[in-house]
Amino acid sequence: MLSHYIFLAFVLLPFRVSAFYFYGYGGDRKCFLKELSKDTLLKGSYNLEVYDDKLADYALPSYNDYGIVIDVEEVFDNNHRVVHQQGSPSGDFSFLALESGEYKICLQSRVNNWVGKTKTKLEIEFEVGFEAMLDMQRKETLESLHGKVSILNSKIVDIRREQQLMREREESFRDISESVNSRAMWWTVTQVTLLIIICVWQMKSLRSFFVKQKVL
């Protein structure tokens, strides 16, 4: 029973999130200490910006010129390094604590080409939670995405049904138009034929009349 309440407490508690930023120069190394329990998942996201004199503000640098080096060390085990990752100026990383204790997370801006002593701004956000909780969150996200995909598929089916209905209406309208045009054409031909017959008949009648009158 007690374990059930503990599980509920873990589920209901939000993830611990901490976000901050600091200023420095290219090549500076900044470290943070985190006390983590066993099977705790630490997720970090970072964004490195470099001061641009033309913009008079900080902006994302070229991936060819700058990068980030990420190290995670176990302080309780003589600073044994368990993570060494090199990334782009903007990205994320994750780490699963295999043992309970204090961990040191270090980020160092890396300058690939010599561009002088440039001022930098590093934004970092840590998210700490149990792996099962994060898996649950990912599952909920996938279910939400699946629901959105189902809605989109339903809308696509409705659109296709409307398109099919429009095609059927267009075909019906085209058949009616062709039928009307065909009838109009035959009615015109009939009228012309009748006019020709009437003209011929009138010509014969006039000719017969003039013959009787001895005009022709």
Curated annotation (Swiss-Prot):
One cellular component (GO) term of this entry: endoplasmic reticulum
Record topology, Lumenal segments: 20-183
Pfam families: EMP24_GP25L
Domain named GOLD: residues: 29-130
Gene Ontology biological process terms from the UniProt entry: endoplasmic reticulum to Golgi vesicle-mediated transport; Golgi organization; intracellular protein transport
Keyword set, alphabetical order: Endoplasmic reticulum, ER-Golgi transport, Membrane, Protein transport, Signal, Transmembrane, Transmembrane helix, Transport
Signal peptide: 1-19
Domain of life the protein comes from: Eukaryota
Main location: endoplasmic reticulum
Subcellular location field: Endoplasmic reticulum membrane
Record membrane topology: Single-pass type I membrane protein
Membrane-crossing residue ranges in chain numbering: 184-204
Cytoplasmic topological domain: 205-216
Family: Belongs to the EMP24/GP25L family.
Function, in words: Involved in vesicular protein trafficking.
Name assigned to this protein: Protein ERP6
